[in-house]
Every structure is written in C-alpha cells, then in structure tokens.
Swiss-Prot record:
One of its GO terms (cellular component) is large ribosomal subunit. Belongs to the universal ribosomal protein uL2 family. Part of the 50S ribosomal subunit. Forms a bridge to the 30S subunit in the 70S ribosome. One of its GO terms (biological process) is translation. This is Large ribosomal subunit protein uL2. Keywords: Ribonucleoprotein, Ribosomal protein, RNA-binding, rRNA-binding. One of its GO terms (molecular function) is rRNA binding. Residues 221-287 are annotated as: Disordered.
C-alpha cells in the first residue's frame, strides 16, 4: 500500500493526497454481511442536533464486522480485502472451513490466501486472535476486548496497535496508542499485529467537497456568529472573544478541560495517564 499525489491541474488536486487502494482486492462487499443503516445526521430520537457538523454525504451500507472472533479452533482463509466506508481500516473477508463467512479488521501484512485462526492455542502470527494471557510480552495487538466476550472495543483504527507490557495475576498491562498504560483482564481476546492502512494519516482531502462526501458539514467559527448563537459572537468587526480563554457554544472551557469523571470506577485500572497531545499532531482522513 502507498499514497498517491496529483499534479495541480485544479485547485482541489493541488494538495490532494490519497491512498492508492492497491491492497483492496474485492470490488463488491459480501451480500450476506451487508445491512442497511439509518443515518441520523447528528440528531437524537427527538430530532435535536446532538453532534454538530454532520449530514449529507454518499450513501453507505454497513458491513457487519466480527469483533468477537469467537469461532475458536476453526481455520479461516482470507478470501479478499475490502474497502469499508465507515472506517479508515480495511476489512478482510474470511471463509471458514465450515462454510461461514465473516469480516474482520484487516491486519497489516495479512494477504489474500493466508490462513488465520482464533483460540487460546492459536500460533503466534499476525491476524490470529487469542487471550491476552497467551500473547508474548512485547507483542503488538489490536482490537482488544475490555470485557471478555463483549468483542474488541479498543485499538481499532487504521495503523493502531497496543503493546503488551507486563502480566501479573489476573491482569495484563497494555500500552495503548495514546501512551496510556491500562490493565485488562487476561482472559480478554486481542488480535496479533497492528491494523492495516497506516498510511491514511499521511493523506489530505484537498478540497471541501471531499469532506462533504464523507458526511461532514462546514464548521463555522464562533467569532463570526451573533452573540445569541455563541459566546464568542457579536461586536463590531473582528472583535476579540472577551474572555480569558476560548469556550464552547455552551460556555464551557474549550481547550484542555478534563472530561473524564474523577471518581470513575475504572480509574483503578489506569496505571499511567496518556500524555497531552495537540490537535495539530493528529493526522487522518479528516485533517
């Protein structure tokens, strides 16, 4: 997989950088694993906007992804690598020996024709799923369960991986992509290797229209709104915000405010908090 840039023959292609999709082998998704999905466009059940800047975009069909990997001891062959419009990672289509078909997140380096398997006795190879108790120290894993049997909930984005740091008692210490070190039960499953399509962080949309295709609407600055719409609004011309720091449309501090509850029960499983990162250091398709 590589990235592709374009000659500046239009303003939209001058800064456009995309992945070349060379690893994608399947043209159409598996019909038995595709379901329709109602797009809420940032609204809740009452029609009230709860997430701004959402709406429009190209129609999508949801691919049912197997995050549990609960077919233990049954080998599966990678039949194809498919594109998924709902995530940056690619999907690997698995054909199990008993005839069942499933999608999983495509790990980096896994190719068509390769065999993967899940279970406590699975070999140490990328793409195989096993309990954290069976993963060697220092190994990279992704699609990690927080609770046994619930399915992978952490480390699922393109290019992400967590590192197994230590094992003690019933818990395994994982270093997450955010640099946070967290304890997870040793019976929780994880997939070896990192998620593929890591080059997505080096891409650039190039124009506003491509962002609209993804279902992202324009973000209007609060300083150009009226005072009834945003605390930064109002004034004559380009007026300052008139506060000690920027705030959200609801008047709460916008930058650096901790949103995690201080007395959250799972705080005892966090051995080391993540380091602070700036917005400029974050990459990805939406940058």
């Amino acid at each position: 997989m590589a990235i592709r840039s374009f000659r500046p023959y239009t303003p939209g292609t001058r800064t456009r950088v995309v992945t070349d999709f060379s690893e994608v082998t399947g043209r159409k998704p598996e019909r038995s694993l595709v379901v329709s999905k109602h797009r809420r466009k940032g609204r809740n059940n009452r029609g009230v906007i709860t997430c701004r800047h959402r709406g429009g975009g190209h129609k999508r069909q949801y691919r049912v992804v197997d995050f549990r990997r609960n077919k233990h001891g049954v080998p599966a062959k990678v039949a194809a690598i498919h594109y998924d419009p709902h995530r940056n990672a690619r999907l690997a289509l698995l054909f199990y020996t008993d005839g069942e078909k499933r999608y999983i997140l495509a790990p980096a380096g896994v190719t068509v024709g390769q065999t993967v398997i899940s279970g406590p006795d699975a070999p140490i190879e990328d793409g195989n799923a096993m309990p954290l108790s069976s993963v060697p120290l220092g190994s990279s894993v992704h699609c990690v369960e927080l609770y046994a049997g619930r399915g992978g909930q952490m480390v699922r984005t393109a290019g992400a991986s967590a590192q197994v740091m230590a094992k003690e008692g019933d818990y395994v210490a994982l270093k997450l992509p955010s640099t946070e070190v967290r304890l997870v039960r040793r019976e929780c499953y994880a997939t070896l290797g990192e998620v593929g399509n890591s080059e997505i962080r080096n891409t650039s949309l190039g124009k506003a229209g491509r962002r609209r295709w993804l279902g992202r609407r324009p973000q209007v600055r609060g300083s150009v709104m009226n005072p009834c719409d945003h605390p930064h609004g109002g004034g004559e011309g380009r007026a300052p915000i008139g506060r000690s720091g920027p705030v959200t449309p609801w008047g709460k501090p916008a930058l650096g405010l901790k949103t995690r509850k201080r007395n959250k029960p799972s705080n005892k499983f966090v051995l080391r908090k993540r380091r602070k990162t700036s917005k400029r250091s974050r990459g990805g398709r939406d940058s």
